[in-house]
């Protein structure tokens, strides 16, 4: 997180994304995997809440492509001018195949039937289509089975005359559990599958067995890496470590300051009753903006460099905090939900623990009403609102 201050952008609620931290993280990852490996930035789920199109533009040539989960995300990037490789990691609906081929979107395949449909669409358009071959080595999710039937399917896919199979990949299931034998077992299964596939004449240039936890916990393997959570300076497990910088801060502002007398209740259901005379501030952010409602009466925010506990039930658009120990709080003051203000920091992981969830869930849940503000050199470089077309 950049600096030691809360930036006031003038918005109701906003997420600051530190581009200098983002590029630092990419540099650290690049140094770990070497210059020859291909980097694919995973920007599904709106780049884990950080803003997909905007991040793609800032990443530029630091990565060799982008990965999304579905066709809608892929076509959204294309329509906003993002060029280069975009790969859909999930399944493709049959009706979307011609459009994906037309827009040069790479597709993940795990059946010869789907591969044939992509192949037919490519031939009908007089072009070639790029595919990524998914292999299930233990995640029990998408992918070819690692048996004779799966091998036959893979060979059929690789023989399609209008397809370029750019990468074969598999996804670790337990890489965040260092003591688990599953990751090593998956690697061996994957290596055997590739070896037998190549013995049958198939050649696939890029090989990938990774996620953020695997890269940090098990090091290099293959020559293509998909960068997800760690790109944003967040770690997939507490036992993993890296010299990464969190890129995201989440802030809002005070809408009203009040004094409550002993016995007065706060918010829906009066789940908090003032034990004495207290001073409160209402903030312009709620669970519709991504703040977990499970933080009601738990956790807190930072305002003027001091900690302010959350009072009562978090509302859809607002929340209330105790500012009794903070002097001179006024309407319009900035409150930090995630990030640093002065000497205090609230991390994504702090919130995830209180909400009994994972850091992925917190950042992916940041809502559309929260303006994304992109910071370079400690200053606002650009901003994007999903609901206000004047902020783009």
Model segments located where?
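Active-site-proximal beta-alpha core segment in soluble small-molecule metabolic enzymes
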Residues: 2, 8, 13-17, 21-24, ...
